[in-house]
Amino acid sequence: MAAALIALAAGANLIAPYDPNFAIRGTGLMPNGDPVGPSAEFLLGTDRLGRDYWSRLLHGARTSLTVGIGANLVATTVGTLVGSVASFAGSPTFRIGIGARRRSFAVPVETILMRFTDVVLSLPVLLLAIALVAIIGPSLLLVTIVIGGLLWTTTARIVYGRMRLLRELEFVVAARALGASSYRILWRHVLPHVVSLIVVYATLGIAAAVLFEASLSFLGVGVPPPAASWGVMISEHAGYYRTDPRLLMLPGAAIMLTVLSFNLLGDALRDALDPHRWG
């Protein structure tokens, strides 16, 4: 299902019969100005401005998945770096000063990074994202960066916890005894054992990012109109919930199916890549 959604989003320009932002005059609206329902000309009808709804749903998939995958790449990269550095940095000692006045001090890198992660975890991320986007101005790139910059904490905690366990195992102790640097141990011996875990949670993170983007767009601080976005489509037609619920149900169902498909994909990957499952 996730692959089908990605294929539809990637081929939106080829599949969509109309420009998603083009208001079709004449046949795009009823004589009284209401949206047209599903027909042979318009597969899923039109919206309040006479734009083809099927075309907007397809391009909305592209927008939502672009933000979801892009934000998740940011979150996964930042979270992996923070968790990796925190698990192996410890509290390095530095010396400053001149001659007899040189002093040694330890910098608790591990503690600093993980306490900072806890602080970010405690923040109301939706309110913070709304504030950041409202101050700077909404755009596709900004929304992607903001979402990724707020969702990295879960990956950081997971990577940190797994690497703390791995660094005490015999193969890591042996590599350290042979003189391998912390950098080599991390990237050559430990990280390969964490990649499968990162892939699983990265897949689950796409679902969270898509839902996050839809929430921001619904509140008017996400992808700016007239760009097609499922959250924008729901927001634009909030007043049609009685007269034409199709305008709300279709993008809502698209969001639900996308989140569900990536959650199921993440669960399947976790079962397939879990070494304990196969004994």
Please state what every model-predicted region is.
Residues 1-23, 113-116, 194:
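N-terminal signal-anchor/first transmembrane alpha helix
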Residues 11-55:
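Short membrane-interfacial helix/loop motifs at transmembrane-helix boundaries
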